[in-house]
């Protein structure tokens, strides 16, 4: 079994907008083919290779089923260094949105309606990111712009985690 990337491992096109059901079916087929139990009577080397392929299939499935991780993977595969640790530059409009969301998060600590409103806004932002990334990656192949969107989405996910940690 050979696969250059996670998409080809499952026989899927390398794109952002993927068919989730096709991904799951492909993963099940690959996982069944390389499951270590199938190699119980094989040599130690063959069992080790089967375990490595099973781990690779599981990691590929975990990454590809998450839209943000899939977008990040596609950008990095196209040679874009997201510099997630060092590059904090964002578009001015997104910076303003961040400030507004931070204020809403502060309010959410004491107000159930504010919590619900922020949760709804973040979900809408996620949907907008999905649509934008499908356009940037699948249609325009503008991986640099997509990389910027992925960094913005990472902020949204971090904020969503902070919101989830807010106690009612």
Curated annotation (Swiss-Prot):
Molecular-function GO term, any one: ATPase activator activity
Gene Ontology cellular component terms for the protein in this record: iron-sulfur cluster transfer complex
SMART domains: DnaJ (SM00271)
J domain boundaries: 5-77
Gene Ontology biological-process annotations: [2Fe-2S] cluster assembly; protein complex oligomerization; protein folding
Classification via NCBIfam families: hscB (TIGR00714), PRK03578.1 (NF002935)
Record's protein name: Co-chaperone protein HscB homolog
């Amino acid at each position: 079994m050979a696969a250059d990337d996670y998409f080809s491992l499952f026989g899927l096109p390398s794109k952002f907008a993927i068919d989730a059901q096709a991904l799951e079916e492909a993963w099940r087929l690959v996982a069944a083919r390389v499951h270590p139990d199938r190699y119980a009577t094989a040599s130690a080397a063959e069992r080790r290779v089967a375990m490595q392929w099973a781990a690779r299939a599981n990691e590929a499935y975990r990454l590809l089923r998450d839209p943000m991780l899939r977008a990040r993977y596609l950008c990095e595969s196209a040679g874009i260094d997201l510099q997630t640790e060092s590059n904090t530059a964002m578009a001015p409009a997104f910076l303003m949105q961040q400030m507004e969301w931070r204020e809403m998060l502060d309010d959410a600590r004491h107000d159930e309606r504010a919590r619900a409103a922020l949760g709804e806004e973040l979900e809408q932002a996620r949907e907008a990111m999905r649509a934008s990334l499908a356009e940037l990656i699948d249609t325009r192949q503008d991986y640099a712009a997509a990389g910027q969107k992925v960094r913005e989405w990472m902020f949204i996910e971090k904020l969503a985690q902070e919101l989830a940690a807010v106690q009612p």
